[in-house]
Amino acid sequence: MTNNYQTPEEAELAFYDAMECHDLEAMMSVWLENDTVACVHPGASRLEGLADIRAGFEQMFEEPAPTMDFTISDTRRQCLGNVAIHTVREEIEIGGQLVSVMLATNVFQKTPFGWRMLLHHASPEFDFELDEMDFTLDHPAPVMLH
């Protein structure tokens, strides 16, 4: 581990910077180096363990794609000893145009080497999708808890 992130916020900023720059090594420096880590990208299977996460970001960064710009807002933070839980709203722009809004949970653990990411889980924001899809339901959908 080359970077010693002094706060979970610093590690989170490095995560989004690495996403924007498609920088695999910077991305991997954010993650905790063990097999308890997990990452869930929207519409994708869960990646478990550092090797799977590396392979997932490697594939994402290798594909020719326009640069994404992230605006993080609506942040909620909770620190419980050596674990920090952040929930955020990710607005993703390509070429200055808003293309997606995600709700994400980022979990960090404090280590002797600084704060490291333990979990990233992102899902589309429901209200944003409904606006974009422009449809109405004939009958209200049942409320389900998972």
Spans of model-derived segments:
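Helix-to-beta-strand junctions that scaffold the AdoMet/dcAdoMet cofactor pocket
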Residues: 32
